[in-house]
Amino acid sequence: AGVPQVDQETSVRQLTRRVARTIRQVGEAFGGYFASAKDAESFEAELTHLLAYQYGAFNSPVWFNCGLWHEYGIEGGGGNYYWDMETKSVQITKNAYEHPQNSACFIQGVDDSLDTMLELQKSEVRLFKYGSGTGSNFSRVRAKGEPLSGGGESSGVLSFLEGFDRWAGSIKSGGTTRRAAKMVILDMDHPEIVDYIDWKLNEEKKAKILIAAGYSADFNGEAYHTISGQNSNNSVRIPDSFMNSYLKDGKWQTTYRMDGKSADEYDAKWLMDKIAYAAWACADPGVQFDDVIQRWHTCKGTGRINATNPCSEFVFLDDTACNLASLNLVKFMREDGEFDVEAYRHAIRVFITAMEIIVDLSSYPTERIARRSHDFRPLGLGYANLGTFLMLNGIPYDSSEGRAWAGVLSAILSGHGYQTSAEIAGNVGTFDCFEENRESMLEVMNLHRDAAYRIDKVSSSSIGGQLDLNCPDYMLDAAREDWDVCLQMGEQFGYRNSQISVIAPTGTIALLMDCDTTGIEPDFALVKFKKLAGGGYFKIVNRSVAEALEHLGYADEQVEEIIAYIIGIGTLKGASHINEETLKSKGFTEEDLAKIEATLSSAFDLNLAFVPGIVDEECLKRLGINPEETQDPEFNMLKSIGFRQEEIDAADEAICGNGTIEGAPHLKEKHYSIFDCANKCGRIGTRFIEPMGHVRMIAAVQPFISGAISKTVNLTNEAAVDDIKNVYVEAWKLGVKCMSIYRDGSKSSQPLSSNSRDDTLEEKLESHDSLQPIRKRLPDERQSVTHKFSVAGHDGYITVGFYDDGSPGEVFLKMSKEGSVISGLIDTIATMTSILLQYGVPLESLVDKFSHVRFEPSGFTSNQDIPIAKSIIDYVFRWLGQKFLSQ
């Protein structure tokens, strides 16, 4: 921001004071927000307290930009647009920080003309430059082959999308190394919908061929820089009519943009298969359910909602912006275990007031966005740390009680937020376009209120899906009271804001609030490895686990033992079998043990602390070990000095932990689900939250949120295409607005199992003979790539040969130490892998099977992407996975 090098901000106190004071001063200048100067001072003090004590946080642009001019006199280049309160018109900024860009989310419209597309490109570049994201629906753009007014035919929407994608890839968002954030949407009835669905899938195939030819697999490398479609999230806009046609095995008609005549007709089932398969293979496109979105649209009188921001939480009219903020739910828990409803309401009231002031304080990239943001004033208040909140209260994430809590917290958030908006409207007036949307606004408010009265059995009124929920009465009463008052005040005063809430990802600001979980997400895993600024890693356990165990009634000693089971004691002191005393008796000195001890806090395997580099040659001699012995791939130092395998395993578990709570001492099995995470935990963990658990959570929250919920449904690598279709159908039935999925390892890969497919999607098998295994040998001359590696000082080479399409077909492994038993076994595994690949066994199946296989030698590697390997085979297959199955 051009902050001078002298006298920079050095504390959160300075940061929060700058932001809170600026908002207070601007609110006073605008008038109508505070009854007196004393009230304004109280507002500033309360906002500062909420920010400084991590009760809530604004979106990043507010922290980056707000108050730099007001507090420090810092100026920036002009060119944006803002609403001038004196002239009641949009003006162009001369100083970027007098009216800073405070919104993170933008939606921009685009019409079927070169002028509007060029203007969109210009405004997108400006948004990316200042660190914001934008989304657009390109369905108005005519399809390939449609006539042009001056003669000839259109090159089609995809040709323009490729151009927009190239510009987005050229701009580093906010001047950082992060790429631009962009959403592209196409309606299901667009004539180019099939090519659009396949766009990213086909481009990923090209990337795979380039990578196989030796180009870097890094996302910022030359291979991905060469292909298109890599700089946006892609979504398809799906109406109810398509979903009904799909469920009834019906047809789907596409229409030309210019004359509305019929274009190609498809089987709806075939189209859904393509959407699900593309998402299965490369995570795009996501889906947006159009009729659900329009049903909850507060401003139907102005126009329909066509698009969303890149993360799909801001869902509103074209050419509008939204400033976001999120509350930290954990901060509103009382010591008696109840939720502090009044404190939560007060924080909502303060933040909504602040965000409302920010609307006209801000500037925007185009004149139209500046005007429409002023006219509609949408806000995006949400929350973070839901996963931690539920864990602390002993509530499983995937449970009726967990969903009920999420629903009621969301209901109070929006109900009290709209209530505050109505109160402000009584003082300074409604948003300018309220009257033309009064009917639809009150209609949606009634939908929200009705949902609050059936929060214990949330259902989609149009589809019929429902969820059984369970929630404390005092929370239900608070939610219903807020919506009753909200509706009464709205009917009397109207509303100052057309929208009030979203559930954003909260990635950066969750760190500012010290949250263990982001947005609506559960915890990723109980144990994580935190990278240290000075190098190395530090093992941490979710801090909420111990507190949750205490709330469940476990004694302090039991909690300590459970935590030790998860993360290990991280020290030799007091460990079973292998400890300071037993190691000293073998010949280790205090100095030797200090070196080993220093590695244990971050080690996930005890053997990795007893390798050359940590144990020096002098120590080896004292132990009676010839240094040359350690070069043997089968060498295990702990075994060589007399420890039995069962002793090593017991010490490993005690010192390094299990990474999971499953099987922990004292823990009752009925409590396992409270600690379930998005992924399997540790080496022995088997539990994780199923995909439908994520879908049901989104569905429980959606009826109480103005916008949508930014959340990805994670699926395991083994998930099938049908699993994704089931997720989409269930989400639609439950009234979810937007949905994206990610299957682990889903980049340019093939299905793990045979799925029933329409014969128009791929050729139908003609006979049972075609089901017999067929070996596809490589051509005599083929391309290959060789990779040198080192595991615990043992050097080797991996050579991968490719088919003509760039897919791996053979693997050779060569260890520098020839003639050893391990070298022969590794050569056998390489031959076996080659034959399996040539018989069509998917590489991802082999990677999944052989990754993390543990035997000696193991230890540090020469590859920064795989810093530690549990064995040579572990390294080889993890490298194959990183190289050929993901970005």
Segments from the language model and where they lie:
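Extended catalytic cores of very large enzyme megasubunits
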Residues: 1-838, 847, 864-866
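Conserved, well-folded catalytic cores of nucleic-acid-processing
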Residues: 170, 835, 839, 853-856, ...
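Nucleotide/phosphate-binding sheet-loop regions of phosphoryl- and nucleotidyl-transfer enzymes
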Residues: 187, 843, 851-853
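Short, surface-exposed loop/turn segments at secondary-structure boundaries that line and modulate
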Residues: 823, 849-871
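A glycine-rich helix N-cap at a beta->alpha junction
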Residues: 872-879
